[in-house]
Amino acid sequence: MIYNFGAGPSVLPKEVLKKVQEELLDFEKSGMSVMEISHRSKSFQEVIDEAQNNLRDLMSIPQNYKILFLQGGASTQFSMIPMNLALGKKAYYAISGAFGKKAYDEAVKLSQTLDFEAISLGSTQSEYYNHLLKIDTSKVDEKMAAYLHITTNNTIEGTTIFPENLPEVNSVPLIADMSSNILAVDYDVSKFGLIYAGAQKNLGIAGLTIVIIREDLLNQKESLSSMMDYRILAQNGSMYNTPPTFAIYLAGLVFKWVKEQGGVKKLEAINHQKARMLYDLIDQSDFYQSPVLNKVERSICNVVFTSPSKELDALFVQKAEEKGFKSIKGHRSVGGMRASIYNAFPIEGVLELVKFMKKFEEENK
């Protein structure tokens, strides 16, 4: 049995893969694959409309928010966000992980040629991002602030800002990179001005990014490139140009699957259960260690851990691969191991990993 612990691209629901397989050569008796039908066709319009409606239902997205299905990875949003929202203002960033730093660095780069200021509220990089930044919102100039940017789940480092710990920002739009825990943790969308997420973790496959943006934040100036302008993309229903049709179709199937599982709250409870099995073992062991300083900040999507040495880490990864546990090696920047147990990851796989970890500890103490 193969278990895919990859951080993204990652495991997909078996039911979704079977549906794709079933429809691959003949989508809804059209005689064509979904990869072949026109994005301007009635059939595909129904696909994107249904996907949008199901995502709105799953996340209880208010009607004054637009849902965009965009090309490229979430990293493209590191540029699009300040270009659309920050001109003439101050853009604030709270940095608790590598991807948060990338977002800030991109804003700094853009601020050298565009009229806005990129400001860091602090970073935990010097502590290897082993805890979340304590965000001091008193440093935010509310009159001049375009937004405060956070990352809700740090995929590499294994930390999460859970809903109860979101910063209080008053009138300042809160922007979240939710790439690795969207639909895995239940957030109140109305607390955010903009949410974005690459699809290849909890939503589907690479090549698609979903943006959820409050209508009042849509750019009103004509100065932006059309492909980088949220307003134009929203006005055209995510089809200003040819969208990533297959990725949207597949995301739509994932949304249906999430609904069939009972919705986001139900899956979040299961995700807590899966993560707890691993964290309980780690906490009770003298052999394994979690690098995350505060237990309440531990991710339920990306469980990061180490053994007593780099040599044992390498042996663990090797033996795990032989056992059928794929892509469990930690990110190259931090080492160790990382078990990414997103929505589609089966609880049986976690139970098997726990057994393996216990046996590995016994054999290598």
UniProtKB/Swiss-Prot annotation:
Provide this UniProt record's keywords sorted from A to Z.
Amino-acid biosynthesis, Aminotransferase, Cytoplasm, Pyridoxal phosphate, Serine biosynthesis, Transferase
Presence of the UniProt keyword Cytoplasm in the record: yes
Principal localisation: cytoplasm
Residues bound to pyridoxal 5'-phosphate: 74-75, 99, 155, 177, 200, 241-242
Q: What is its EC number?
A: 2.6.1.52
Identify the stretch annotated as signal peptide in this record.
Answer: none
According to the lineage, what is the superkingdom? Bacteria
Instruction: Give the Gene Ontology MF terms in alphabetical order.
Output: O-phospho-L-serine:2-oxoglutarate aminotransferase activity; pyridoxal phosphate binding
Family the UniProt entry places it in = Belongs to the class-V pyridoxal-phosphate-dependent aminotransferase family. SerC subfamily.
Quaternary state and interactors: Homodimer.
Q: What does the entry list as the binding residues for L-glutamate? A: 40
Q: Which residues are recorded with the post-translational modification N6-(pyridoxal phosphate)lysine? A: 201
Pathways involved: Amino-acid biosynthesis; L-serine biosynthesis; L-serine from 3-phospho-D-glycerate: step 2/3
Q: Which organism is it from?
A: Lactococcus lactis subsp. cremoris (strain MG1363)
Membrane as a keyword of this entry, yes or no, is no
Catalytic activity reads: O-phospho-L-serine + 2-oxoglutarate = 3-phosphooxypyruvate + L-glutamate; 4-(phosphooxy)-L-threonine + 2-oxoglutarate = (R)-3-hydroxy-2-oxo-4-phosphooxybutanoate + L-glutamate
Q: Which InterPro entries match?
A: Aminotrans_V_dom (IPR000192), Aminotrans_V_PyrdxlP_BS (IPR020578), Pser_aminoTfrase (IPR022278), PyrdxlP-dep_Trfase (IPR015424), PyrdxlP-dep_Trfase_major (IPR015421), PyrdxlP-dep_Trfase_small (IPR015422)
The annotation note on the cofactor reads: Binds 1 pyridoxal phosphate per subunit.
Q: Could you tell me what this protein does?
A: Catalyzes the reversible conversion of 3-phosphohydroxypyruvate to phosphoserine and of 3-hydroxy-2-oxo-4-phosphonooxybutanoate to phosphohydroxythreonine.
Question: How is this protein annotated for GO cellular component?
Answer: cytoplasm
Q: What cofactor does its activity depend on?
A: pyridoxal 5'-phosphate
EC category name:
transferase
Name of protein: Phosphoserine aminotransferase
Compartments where found: Cytoplasm
Q: Which GO terms describe its biological process?
A: L-serine biosynthetic process
